[in-house]
Amino acid sequence: MMRYKLVIAEKPSVAQSLAAVIGATARKDGYLEGNGWRVSWCVGHLAGLADADSYDPKYAKWRYDDLPILPEHWQMVVGKDKKKQFDILKKLMNAPDVTEVVNACDAGREGELIFRSVYELAGRQKPMKRLWISSMEDSAIREGFANLRPGVDYDGLRDAALCRAKADWLVGINATRLFSVLYHRTLNIGRVMSPTLALIVQREAEIDTFQPVPFYTVALELPGLTVSGERISDRASAEQLKEACQGAAVTIKKVECKEKSEKPPALYDLTTLQRDANRLLGFTAQQTLDYLQSLYEKKLCTYPRTDSRYLTGDMADSLPVLVNLVASAMPFRKGIAITCDPHTVINDKKVTDHHAVIPTRNLKDADLSALPAGEKAVLELVALRLMCAVAQPHIYSETVVIAACAGGEFTTKGKTVKHPGWKALEDAYRAKMKDAEPKKEGAEKALPELTEGQTLSVSAAIVKEGKSSPPQHFTEDTLLSAMETAGKENMPEDAERKGLGTPATRAGILEKLVSAGFLERKKSRKTVQLLPSHDAVSLITVLPEQLQSPLLTAEWEYRLGEIERGQLAPEEFLDGISAMLKDLVGTYQVIKGTEYLFTPPREVVGKCPRCGGEVAELQKGFFCQNDSCKFAIWKNNKWWAAKKKQPTKAVVSALLNDGRVRVTGLYSEKTGKTYDATVVLEDDGQYANFKLEFDQRKGGSR
């Protein structure tokens, strides 16, 4: 009997690429076969944790008395729409001619969980190996199959993935039900979603309460340069200094010139790539991940979901060839000499599961013009970063001038580039992008020759007024940065990063917040801001600290890493979350005075003709907000319905403010035709009535 090894990939397209390399080319029902291999696939998560009512039918209804729900024995179930593919995999795994199963799902936490869930439910009868690769290039696939690792080496990764899923289930099920029952509306709460939302709501509160502080600076125009003084808090003092300097002599106290060097940027991990793609290209984090995943499957980029910005030592020798190959494929670098110093990007200690995102050698034969625009743009960013990271430093001389006049001190800086280094590539890319992002401060600025003790005359003195700036609204770029550091904006480069979520999950978290109605993307000039909705602010107002604390959730993420490394027992992690939920259910009480928070703000459309109160639009019509007044214009008003019209916000606003409004397309029951007329509001104190007026000059056609 012929013996086979079964390979299970995460999706059909990856399975086909693997099968082509190992010679499994014969198509079967749900798998490929050949050369002693069978290759099949999952379709994302085939199985997941069971819903609450699977443990007890009473959990189908949301009741406070049933909380917290803490399963003692967890259940995994196959999705109804995934059963066919699961049955194929189960049959293949248990086939007598299959001797070994190879986990070829994505080499990361989620990929491990996707495979292990199916493997466990199928009975775990066959030995298991792990394919762990960072590139879909044929050579990388061959090397991976030649060095399959024991599946048990990744038990820690499986445990971390399963604990993450259980923690999300526990917090999501219990907190969502608790707050939904207490506040009488569905409030979706997530282990990572809620603290991420809290960051945004807190930022908006800081912006709303910000009070700008004016300041003044005195600038002196000298021959060939302008020098500026320090900030002054009151205009009178600034004007006094300006008058004292007008026409006076300035003495150059200090001229200091230093040669400085700016190191090349590190390679991309997923988060830094998503940030740059958002800032430079306007892509959302999810779009960037999707484009990069497609490039990975097309064998043009390495594994996307990485948190490393370095390469391993065994890649040093082949790196110069790759860099030159990449440079030849990028037209914007023409005329710029390409250099390669591998040591700037090699660091084995900073590579865990996967190295940084870089292009592959397949660029050499690829038709990049055939790529979708989004994928091509992301590929160019990745290529640019590789070329910059191994290029020479940017070297420049910086001159600092300090001058004195009328008892005040004034400064200016000059910059002269000695060797552009990696910035030549960046500048060429930006030129291609047609100023996609404004150039940062620090552009080249030459100063005239100056000597200490030299005196110059002031040709003009000017007072410039400014104001302190409020915090900026979050963009996906800046929010990803805040999530990565759990809100600590000044974390040292070498600090242990804990963060909200992982590079693989942050994009999905943002999309969930948008789809749930908690976040709105609002375009502002060249950026897209992330703004919290009314419900988002209300939710964070009532959530206790433990559910919105970025630091606590980041600590949980760190502990998942400890589980992955075998340094923490899964039970200890889950027991801590269960204890927190028990305490939450037992002690939380509805905050007094917050019942109104989850009532959407009502837009006022005009003044009430009866009492002068405010009339606002609600779901079924327009109503006076004065409780003692019954004025209303219903959207299903019979008078309007007979004319096949519904009173809109604009129409009602005009009726309330002007007493009349011109309406087109009114239907005549008598003629069956439409006509235009002026509708006049006549309120008799009990009902809102309407009448028509026609323009006699035009005959008022009906």
Q: Predicted segment positions?
A:
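Intrinsically disordered, low-complexity regulatory segments
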Residues: M1-A165, W169, P470
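C-terminal or mid-to-C-terminal helical accessory/interaction module adjacent to the motor/catalytic core
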Residues: P96, D138-L222, C257-S261
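Active-site phosphate-binding and catalytic loops of NTP-dependent enzymes
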Residues: A26-Y31, G151-G156, R177-V181, A205-F210, ...
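Conserved short loop/turn motifs at secondary-structure junctions
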Residues: R3-L6, A104-A107, H184-T186, C257-A266, ...
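Amphipathic alpha-helical transducer elements in NTP-driven molecular machines
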Residues: P12-A19, G36-V39, V43, G79-K90, ...
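Metal- or metallocofactor-binding catalytic centers and their adjacent structured scaffolds
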Residues: A236-Y268, Q274
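Basic, low-complexity terminal or inter-domain segments flanking catalytic cores
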Residues: M2-L6, K82, M93, T99, ...
